[in-house]
């Protein structure tokens, strides 16, 4: 069963699934997993432990996609392959460029540029995250016109040479999720229980394939997505809307039952109204709840001083620095 829980920010999606996990733990029902983005995993684990209590680890766990890969590796083993660290990856990229630089039309100069080597490594990571192999990238290069096709062809050559430099006896971090996708059918994970997914706007190509594999394995799956409506609505939520439609389509194609639950926000906040109408230049007026303030300043310097003073004031009142953001158009 695939269940989508949708609603605007503050509607209570996260609170609902955490309460469901808490109730399952209190009834001694195991097999609950909360899948969240890597950067949110520690905070989610702390919050879930606060809600569910000290018995939580017996019945539920919080994982990122990388954490799920580690869990499956612990179950099935690594096959004797040793992971390559960051320094080793850079060395392998340098070796890869040495082997193919004479065939490169755009990135031949990267052979003597450590900075460009790092950028090529990031490009290889992006392609791997999207589920592209060197062969598929070369096929895309043949269809792309002009300079774009040449760049993709170079990336395909570099990608193939990089994986050859890594070798079969080592594993690369960029291929970790692809390896997880390949080995997941052998694992017991997801054959029962309930998988909750929260904190995502969309998924990479490999992550989406993993979700499709998981929803077909027997465990129930609940995905929380922040959006106003599934059919149409604000452009702000378009990415989440496409993700929801894709998940429902994949479930339908696999014969997996699905349903959508929409949670209404408890109250409309000024911040929500600002997010909805900030760029629409409407003449509508709204009552403020004193959470949004509009200031004018004589200069950019004065604007910066005001922003800095407000940030310091918030920090001194107990707000964490990491919860304060300064957004600018351009200076």
Q: Where do the protein language model's features map onto the residues?
A:
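Short, surface-exposed, charged/polar-biased interaction segments
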Residues: 69, 83-93, 114-118, 141-145, ...
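Conserved P-loop NTPase-based nucleic-acid remodeling module centered on helicase motor cores
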Residues: 28-146
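N-terminal low-hydrophobic presequence detector
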Residues: 38, 59, 172-175, 326
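General structural signal for alpha-helix termini and helix-helix connectors
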Residues: 74, 78, 164-168, 313
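Conserved motor-region signature of P-loop NTPase helicases/translocases
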Residues: 1-47, 187-192, 196, 201-331
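Non-catalytic, well-ordered alpha-helical scaffold segments
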Residues: 42, 46, 63-66, 70, ...
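Accessory N-terminal region flanking or inserted into the helicase ATPase core
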Residues: 1-4, 99-199, 206, 231-235, ...
């Amino acid at each position: 069963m695939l269940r989508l829980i949708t609603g605007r920010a503050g509607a209570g999606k996260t609170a609902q699934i955490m309460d469901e996990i808490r109730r399952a733990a209190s009834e001694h029902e195991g097999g609950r997993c909360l899948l969240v983005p890597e950067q949110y995993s520690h905070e989610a684990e702390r919050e879930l432990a606060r809600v569910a209590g000290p018995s939580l680890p017996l019945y539920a766990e919080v994982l990122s996609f990388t954490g799920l890969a580690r869990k499956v590796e612990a179950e099935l083993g690594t096959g004797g392959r040793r992971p390559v660290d960051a320094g080793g990856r850079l060395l392998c990229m340098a070796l890869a460029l040495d082997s193919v630089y004479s065939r490169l039309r755009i990135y031949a100069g990267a052979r003597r540029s450590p900075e460009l080597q790092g950028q090529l490594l990031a490009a290889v990571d992006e392609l791997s995250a999207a589920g592209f192999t060197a062969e598929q990238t070369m096929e895309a290069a043949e269809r792309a016109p002009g300079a774009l096709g040449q760049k993709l062809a170079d990336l395909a050559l570099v990608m193939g040479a990089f994986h050859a430099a890594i070798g079969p006896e080592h594993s690369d971090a960029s291929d970790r999720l692809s390896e997880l996708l390949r080995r997941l059918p052998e694992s017991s994970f997801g054959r029962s229980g309930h998988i909750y997914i929260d904190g995502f706007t969309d998924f990479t190509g490999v992550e989406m394939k993993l979700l499709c594999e998981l929803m077909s394995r027997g465990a129930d799956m609940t995905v929380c997505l922040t959006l106003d409506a599934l059919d149409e609505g604000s452009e702000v939520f378009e990415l989440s809307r496409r993700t929801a439609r894709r998940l429902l389509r994949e479930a339908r194609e696999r014969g997996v039952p699905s349903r959508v639950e929409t949670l209404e926000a408890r109250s409309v906040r000024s911040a929500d109204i600002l997010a909805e109408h900030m760029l629409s230049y409407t003449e509508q007026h709204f009552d403020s709840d004193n959470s949004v303030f509009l200031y004018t300043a004589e200069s950019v310097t004065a604007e910066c001083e005001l922003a800095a003073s407000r940030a310091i004031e918030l920090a001194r009142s107990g707000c964490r620095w990491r919860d304060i953001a300064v957004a600018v158009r351009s200076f």
